[in-house]
Amino acid sequence: MTHLQEELFKLQDTVYRNFHSSLMPGVDKEAVIGVRTPVLRAFAKKFSKTEEAEQFMTELPHKYYEENNLHMMLIAQIKDYDKCISETEKFLPHIDNWATCDLPLPKCFDKNKEDILERAKKWIAADTTYVKRYGMGVMMSLFLDEDFKEEYIQLVAGVKSEEYYVNMMIAWYMATALAKQWDAAIPYIQERRLSEWVHRKSIQKAVESYRITPEQKEYLKGLR
């Protein structure tokens, strides 16, 4: 066991481990230590200032789920965009679950929209489930507000997949698009442009959202 792994096991919460493992059926429970996210985030902040952190980021793949989450948190702290994107590209193929994939994006992405948009398009076109999901997450987080264009919805909505975690992200994206860009997103529901499963899940998520008005929710229920 490495020194880092020993430190992570000191932060273990076995009750949390049992609960969180049940939410990730594709991840071996033996690969989950059981460190709560706020605790791991505090650890990452201190760990990022050590030489051990730089070495750790070169040692892929990692053994534990928490090591992968720690890696993502370390990437998110990198302020230099070129270095950040380089580390992101190296790590994305190693993501093996939705929870690691959906951790907050690096803040420097927000200041480099032109480049990150092109990379998001490439990631969405990837064959790998979580690289594809990550690209969709970028579009959802960074391109549904002031930088939105109608054609961006098609980038995500146009993806056809049999993968549960890809389809779930499409639905999450569509529900968010309905909340933020109703006029551009609603035709995809009205005209049933999505697969049946994604269509229904998008409506479900939108109806559950506090950002959708009661009138919009009633209208969406009629489109099920």
Where are the language model's segments positioned?
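Alpha-helical scaffold domains
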Residues: 1-224
